[in-house]
């Protein structure tokens, strides 16, 4: 069994005292990735069990988390986190730094947690504490997705915890640091298909007509020197042939000869195709008329293509960021929490 978390994420360990959160964190994460509420309590009071120091401890905990997320570092919160109210402040931090929140819940049987606490001389504070925490967890656990967690994992037994072999760190969709180009970055085509074909040929791309397999739209585009196009949005509107531009971009993205990020015109078209109320101005009316001449199947393909576009890409070992109309540095390479 494995758990997958985004490479840049805020991971909340959730569980009552004695559920094994600290042991879990030590086993699966690096030492400095884990921010412990107990350690923070000790820092501000010299006693990890001093409950009167909890408010100060969580001020320190949130400060450390904010600095780590600001610096683009995966961070794990080792605290009970059994109350939705407690998790809310941490989710707010994740959103502030455009980081995806993940919950790993250790929902072990109450008796197991009680027995473990009785074996710890510094934590034997009575079974009623575990019972209350367990009730709080039970009340709130079903609402984790609604709270804003992007991924949730619930481990309900010691066996499940012990059978966890690996926590896999997944790259964000916008992370293409391994691609080094050369790149040809093309923006604001606005339905001008013929001009785009001329430009691609001038840049050395070979454009061939092939059998239409339903995804290549009868086009095959490649560069003999393995250059790659990055379309920087605004594929549609204003020009005479937005559907052909879409087919070109969709075919090239499918084959790997191009990447594409959306522009505001593309996002507006997506809203319209999904039935949202938008103003048919700035060329959108013409695009809708052009699309209406084609098949319903193609319109479905366009909807799926636009839905799958990523806001920006980070390329070339982090030296290049590509987005329509720019992106603030602190948002580069981030996800939306």
Kindly label every feature range from the protein language model.
Residues 185-187, 231, 260-262, 322-323:
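Short hydrophobic beta-strand that contains or immediately precedes a catalytic carboxylate
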Residues 129, 224-226, 238-322, 329, ...:
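Active-site neighborhood of divalent metal-dependent phosphoester bond hydrolases
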Residues 162-246:
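N-terminal active-site segment of His-dependent metallophosphoesterases
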Residues 38, 188, 234, 263-264:
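Active-site glycine-centered loops adjacent to acidic/histidine catalytic or metal-binding residues
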């Amino acid at each position: 069994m494995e758990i997958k978390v985004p490479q840049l994420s805020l991971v909340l360990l959730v569980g009552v005292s004695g559920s094994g959160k600290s042991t879990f964190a030590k086993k699966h994460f690096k030492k400095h990735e884990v921010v412990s509420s107990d350690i923070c309590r000790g820092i501000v009071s010299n006693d990890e069990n001093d409950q009167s120091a909890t408010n100060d401890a969580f001020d320190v905990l949130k400060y450390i988390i904010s600095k780590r997320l600001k610096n683009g570092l995966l961070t794990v919160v080792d605290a009970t986190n059994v109350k939705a109210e407690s998790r809310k402040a941490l989710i707010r931090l994740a959103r502030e730094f455009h980081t995806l929140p993940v919950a790993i819940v250790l929902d072990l049987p109450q008796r197991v947690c009680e027995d473990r606490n009785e074996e710890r001389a510094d934590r034997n504070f009575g079974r009623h504490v575990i019972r209350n925490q367990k009730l709080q967890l039970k009340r709130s656990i079903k609402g984790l997705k609604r709270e804003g967690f992007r991924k949730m994992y619930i481990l309900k037994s010691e066996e499940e915890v012990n059978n966890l072999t690996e926590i896999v760190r997944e790259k964000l969709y916008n992370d293409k640091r391994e691609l080094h180009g050369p790149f040809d970055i093309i923006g604001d085509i606005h339905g001008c298909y013929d001009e785009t074909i001329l430009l691609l040929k001038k840049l050395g791309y070979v454009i061939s007509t092939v059998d239409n397999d339903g995804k290549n739209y009868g086009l095959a585009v490649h560069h003999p020197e393995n250059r790659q196009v990055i379309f920087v949005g605004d594929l549609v509107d204003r020009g005479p042939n937005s559907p052909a531009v879409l087919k070109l971009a969709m075919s090239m993205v499918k084959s790997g000869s191009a990447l594409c990020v959306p522009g505001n015109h593309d996002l507006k078209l997506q809203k319209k195709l999904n039935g949202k109320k938008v103003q048919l101005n700035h060329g959108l009316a013409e695009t809708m008329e052009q699309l209406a001449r084609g098949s319903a199947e193609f319109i479905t393909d366009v909807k799926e293509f636009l839905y799958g576009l990523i806001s920006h890409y980070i390329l070339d070992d982090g030296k290049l960021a590509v987005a329509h109309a720019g992106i603030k540095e602190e948002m580069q390479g981030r996800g939306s929490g």
